[in-house]
Amino acid sequence: MRLTEIEFTEAKPVEGYGPGFFRIGGEVYEGATLVLPTGVTVWGGFDDTEALIAAAKSIDVLFVGMGVEIAPVPAAFRSAIEAAGPGVETMASPTACRTYNVLLSEGRRVGLALLPV
């Protein structure tokens, strides 16, 4: 079996997570976190859509990690993001991290909004 190391260009992969934190691109972020092609930042939750709407033209899908278990996102949040362009996919945060990394490694245009586990 041939193993090849994945190289990420500008976007940063999720390298790990734990209770209340995410390790992304070699840095640790505590609490809710937003990962976009433009960078990684603290996320204010579902009322904080400004950065997501601003990045809408640079992503095709936004993965929303809902914490330990999957749960629906608020309808107003989903509507605001989808009106700006990208699709919204919800899942548990660990699953969202893995899915984001796989699609990022394929060169896809993805974003990630995470609630901590």
Language-model features: locations:
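Non-catalytic interface/targeting segments
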Residues: 1-46, 105-117
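Short glycine-/small-residue-rich flexible loop motifs, especially phosphate/cofactor-binding loops
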Residues: 19, 75-78, 100
